[in-house]
Amino acid sequence: MASPQSPSSSPRHYSLFLAIFSLAVGGFCIGTTEFVAMGLIQEIAHNLKITVPEAGHFISAYALGVVIGAPPIIAILGAKVPRKTLLLCLMLFYGIANACTALAHTPETVLVSRFIAGLPHGAYFGVGALVAAELAGPSRRASAVAQMMMGLTVATVIGVPLATWLGQHFGWRAGFEFSATIAFFTLIAVACFVPNIPVQATASIKTELAGLKNINMWLTLAVGAIGFGGMFSVYSYVSPILTEYTKVNIQIVPIALALWGIGMVIGGLAAGWLADKNLNKTIVGVLISSAIAFVVASFLMSNIYSAIGSLFLIGLTVMGLGGALQTRLMDVAGDAQTLAASLNHSAFNLANALGAFLGGWVLSHQMGWIAPIWVGFVLSLGGLIILLIAFAVEKATQKA
């Protein structure tokens, strides 16, 4: 009896473009939801009658949901449930959680709904990346995964500014209603254009969980958890920094977020090209350049034009860390590729939680609106130190 063929090896009865585009729409939805709370943090705080640092806990709650949710979903469901079915369930859950946020009217219910919304985040990207790679085949898998992930980056350019604008003009809940609507369209797109992929016979919980013993994988994840946190220490409070310190009109915030997102798109693509040449040097370069960008920004935030330029520079330098670390994880994760893919997003959202928490902490201790930028500088250096330790451990492991 013939063995089942994968979609990439059997006659194609689907559009690769539409399949990956459908997955990217889900990434756009998740990216919009993840960042919109940062753009609307002042509106949320005012409406719920809490302080801006207290509203920052909603950002941390979402990020912690990602950290906690991805590993068990991937390890348990990822080994048993068909990937298309899993993607549909994850996005349905995501849309409902965002609708619950829009309906929440107390700080406690918003906090819980944001945590719940974060649970399927990492699993969606982990499974979506594997689906994109399998559909494209070995010769195009890297570009397919990059295209799927582009939905997240494009969200920072289009989705977040649009959701922020909606929240400012129609109430902050409109931003989350927008995200829930995108989740609904993602469900339709994935159901219609992503083909069914059978569960691999070799997939097992044991194989994935074995990766938890890999020290090189954990150190690489730690680089992202610390080094990427600097972006969120600033991004989480960019709205009050611009309005309270730079003294710009709040209507400028969506424009600043869009330019930050453009920097992220350019930086991510440039870092990907450089990583093909030398992966480890690219990661080092990203961490050093981002540290420099934070220092530059700390001195240039008093003027509207230099402030927006500084935010563009931070986005340009920091975003390259994501794809480069994902590629490094492929090199060090061994047989636990699926778990590593999901844990990468857990690490980045741990960075989200850490950055938002530390940024809020320095603000709550009256250290000034520029203090979150210096937090970013410290976290970038911390990520660099961990990376150098990872290189040393990897070298010692290879000699052993």
Go through the PLM ranges and name each one.
Residues 332-368, 376:
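A late C-terminal transmembrane helix in Major Facilitator Superfamily
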Residues 107-109, 137-194, 241:
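Helix-loop-helix hairpin linking two adjacent transmembrane segments in secondary transporters
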Residues 113-151:
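Cytoplasmic helix-loop-helix junction between adjacent transmembrane helices
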Residues 281-325:
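C-terminal transmembrane helical hairpin of 12-TM major facilitator-type secondary transporters
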Residues 97-100, 108-117, 305-313:
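Paired small-residue
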Residues 85-99, 281-296, 377:
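Structural signature of the two symmetry-related core transmembrane helices
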Residues 49, 81, 103-109, 300-302:
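Helix-breaking motifs and short loop linkers at transmembrane-helix boundaries and internal kinks
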Residues 69-82, 267-279, 363-364:
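Helix-to-loop junctions at the C-terminal end of transmembrane segments
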